[in-house]
């Protein structure tokens, strides 16, 4: 599939992607999404691709200090108020972006259903949701994801890789988990984590 069909959405969302290193996180997660979609041909490519592209744009509406303090370093950060707020803002901004780029109401509704609760909801709604969730996780196993996220969490790369290794059972698809395991092994090697 030619992913340039999503270029207008990227352009329309660009301003919102400049918060919280989403201009790094989202393109990497989008690439993982395309890999997962190739492995799950029954999933809806447009819905999954648009959902991963837009799922975190709501962070644009949150103060950077709150993002780090409450969104990553608080005791129960996955249930923090800023997590819920960024999901609601993601739905609002995502709707605007998709309308501005000509997507149908049915596509907008399906994408926003995934965005709303993507961090805070305990279980996915369906396969499209599972693929978006796994795509969102996979970038954390790359060297770049480790470099960015260990700063968010205020830990060393080794500590963060150990943290994401413990989260492997949370993958929603077997393919996602296998990709994460392979990427994590490569990251451990590249970052010399057997020493550092």
What are these regions (language model features)?
Residues 21, 45, 82, 86:
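Conserved acidic
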Residues 4-28, 32, 67-81:
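Active-site flanking loop/helix segments enriched in acidic
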Residues 29-30, 84-100:
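An active-site-proximal "capping" alpha-helix that borders the catalytic cofactor pocket
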Residues 45-77, 90, 110-120:
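His-Asp-centered metal-binding catalytic motifs of divalent-metal-dependent phosphohydrolases/nucleases
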Residues 93-124:
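Internal catalytic-core helix/loop-beta-alpha segment
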Residues 36, 60, 97:
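Short alpha-helical functional segments enriched in proximate histidine and acidic residues
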Residues 15-43, 54, 64-65, 103, ...:
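Divalent metal-dependent phosphate-bond-processing catalytic cores, especially two-metal-ion Mg2+/Mn2+ enzymes
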């Amino acid at each position: 599939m030619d992913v340039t069909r999503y270029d207008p959405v990227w352009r329309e969302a660009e301003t919102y992607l400049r918060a919280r290193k989403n201009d790094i996180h989202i393109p990497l997660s989008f690439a993982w999404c395309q890999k997962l979609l190739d492995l799950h041909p029954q999933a809806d490519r447009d819905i999954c691709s648009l959902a991963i592209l837009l799922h975190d744009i709501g962070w644009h509406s949150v103060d950077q200090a709150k993002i780090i303090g409450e969104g990553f370093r608080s005791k129960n950060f996955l249930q923090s108020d800023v997590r819920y707020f960024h999901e609601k803002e993601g739905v609002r901004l995502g709707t605007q972006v998709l309308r501005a780029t000509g997507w149908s109401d049915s596509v907008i509704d399906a994408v926003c259903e995934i965005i709303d609760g993507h961090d805070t909801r305990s279980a996915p709604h369906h396969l499209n949701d599972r693929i978006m969730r796994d795509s969102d996780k996979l970038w954390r196993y790359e060297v770049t994801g480790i470099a960015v996220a260990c700063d968010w969490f205020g830990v060393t790369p080794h500590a963060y890789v150990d943290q994401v290794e413990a989260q492997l059972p949370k993958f929603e698809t077997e393919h996602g988990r296998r990709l994460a395991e392979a990427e994590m092994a490569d990251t451990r090697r590249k970052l010399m984590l057997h020493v550092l």
